[in-house]
A protein has these predicted regions:
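N-terminal Rossmann-like dinucleotide-binding module
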Residues: 1-51
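Beta-loop-alpha module in the N-terminal Rossmann-like domain of NAD(P)-dependent dehydrogenases
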Residues: 48, 54-117
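Rossmann-like dinucleotide-binding domain that binds NAD(P)(H)
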Residues: 153-227
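A structural signal for isolated positions on well-ordered beta-strands in alpha/beta enzyme cores
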Residues: 3-5, 28-30, 97, 126, ...
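A contiguous active-site-proximal alpha/beta segment in oxidoreductase catalytic domains
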Residues: 63-64, 72-75, 104-169
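Short, well-ordered alpha-helices that flank and scaffold nucleotide-derived cofactor binding pockets
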Residues: 14, 18-22, 44, 87, ...
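NAD(P)-dinucleotide binding in Rossmann-like oxidoreductases
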Residues: 213-274
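A short helix->loop->beta-strand "cap" motif at the edges of active sites that frequently abuts
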Residues: 26, 93-97, 121-123
Length: 275
């Protein structure tokens, strides 16, 4: 029996749970949240649609109620308590695989501490960047000539530059085939904004990313609703435009639909891959 825990049953955690429901794995799943209302919503969402007879779900409020060993843990809380939760989890439970939601942590020192914890406890860890699982990005990846530089740009209004840049950087790194990059934050506007998530902050401006082979990524976030979502990718003779909200991409002027997968469609696939 595959043993899974989802810690944090809010908006995103409940979607992870829905995604796990699609898995064919015979599994016991523990959903952890100290807020009983969140657990109730997660349960309601899980119970929508057909029953998965391969799964048994437990809704609990404390990490101490988890079993001694888990094959996979998804930590889907907000970033502020995440390190504390990770420490509490690994102090009690032997974990094989962990998926961490971004933004990972709120302090620079937290990253080193978390890395040490994961290494000491021999845990495999991933940050959830789901675009790698979108079929059309895999199609684009097959078109890219990794021997030639990739030029990628993404611009939109109020898209959460701090919180969401990791998604664009991750898919850029996949497409470029590179393992390292340098980020230039000199284009950030030095004015703090309130994030859509209460208690967090954001910035507008430009982030420039470059790799050793000459590939570049330019991320632009502005407080101007007239600026609309657009991603462009240039590599060799290819000129690709992607518009995720409208569900299409254009390759050298040839427009075609693309399918954007939700988290509720993905986590089960990831769980099976980690098996």
């Amino acid at each position: 029996m595959y043993k899974i825990a989802v810690i944090g049953a809010g908006q995103l955690g409940s979607r992870h749970l829905q995604g796990l429901k699609l898995s064919k794995l015979k599994s016991d799943i523990w959903v952890v949240d100290n807020n009983p209302n969140s657990l109730q919503i997660a349960q309601q969402r899980y119970e929508e649609g057909e029953v998965n007879s391969n799964q048994t779900i437990y809704y609990i409020q404390l990490i101490d109620q988890l079993p001694a060993e888990l094959d996979l843990v998804v930590i889907a809380t907000s970033s502020k308590p995440r390190l504390t939760i990770l420490k509490s989890l690994l102090a009690k439970v032997k974990v094989v695989n962990i998926i961490l939601e971004k933004f990972l942590f709120t302090g620079l020192a937290d990253y080193d501490e978390a890395a040490q914890l994961l290494q000491i406890n021999h845990v495999n860890a991933w940050v959830n960047c789901p675009r790698r699982l979108f079929g059309f990005y895999a199609e684009i990846d097959s078109m890219i000539d990794k021997q030639k530089p990739l030029v990628m740009e993404y611009a939109d209004s109020n898209w959460g530059l701090c919180c969401n840049s990791i998604h664009m950087i991750d898919i850029f790194m996949m497409l470029s085939g590179e393992k390292a990059y340098i980020a230039d934050f000199s284009g950030i506007i030095p004015q703090v904004k309130d994030s859509r998530r209460n208690g967090y902050i954001e910035f507008d401006g430009i982030v420039n990313v470059s790799t050793p082979n000459g590939s570049t990524l330019r991320l632009t976030c502005v407080d101007d609703d007239t600026v609309q979502h657009q991603m462009t990718i240039i590599n060799g003779s290819y000129h690709i435009i992607i518009n995720e909200p409208e569900g299409f991409m254009s390759v050298d002027g040839n427009k075609q639909p693309v399918h954007i997968k939700y988290q509720s469609q993905l986590t089960g696939v990831v769980a099976e891959d980690r098996k």
